[in-house]
Amino acid sequence: MKFTPEGEYLAKRAKEYMEFIKDVKHGLYTYKTELEGTIKIGSPYTYSKFELTDVLYRYSQEHKNIKFEIINDQSNNLFRMILENHIELGFVCGDFEGDVDKILVKQNKAYIVSKDPIDLMKLPQMQRIDYKTNDKSKEILDEWWKNTYGNNPPVGMFAGYVEFAWQLVDKGLGYACCFLPEGFEKVYNLCLTPILDDDGNSIIRNTWLVYPKGKQMSSVVNNFIKFIKDNIEIRE
């Protein structure tokens, strides 16, 4: 059978159309099957409490079949777990260095948290409440203290977790130096005094989504990373 030029054109386009339909069906099947699974995410306490729920909720609205396993720990421990491939990715507070890719997701300002307004010049004579935090956060706050008061921070009462420190502050037992999320003052009725550098700028701590550089990731993890880049990333 010999086709006319018009018939040959239609036959060629019909073949292309069938191949297109086949590719679309395969793509939809792959998309559906690969975007089912569990993502193991590390997150420090404060990010989990104030930010992570909203991030996961927004992502879950688009991807109903994805489950999450959340590992709560300090950022330095989470960063090590990422480097050692114990978790696929994690949110870490502070600028940790290593063989990773990272996405800036939050910048938190530092404050002195107290029951009542304070005079910064009298701060060294006041009761300090310390708590468990990561090394990078401590380094930033300790450096500010040394630059401001000329000596190391005093050893204060140790509260363990930061939320217990806030509760002790609320009882008037001292002050705490913390990086706080937006909206903190709506949850805790405490006095916040901004911690500023010599130029009057806020002391900032970065929070990153971190994952191993060059590692082959599943489509589920890659999709979550893309969601963070498209919806959460702070572009400096």
Task: Label each region the model flagged.
Residues 98-140, 204-214, 229:
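Hydrophobic/proline-rich hinge and linker segments of small-molecule sensing/allosteric domains
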Residues 38-42, 90, 129-130, 176, ...:
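Short, well-ordered beta-strand segments
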Residues 2-30:
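Alpha-helical "hinge/linker" immediately C-terminal to small N-terminal DNA-binding modules
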Residues 97-110, 185-197:
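Ligand-binding "clamshell"
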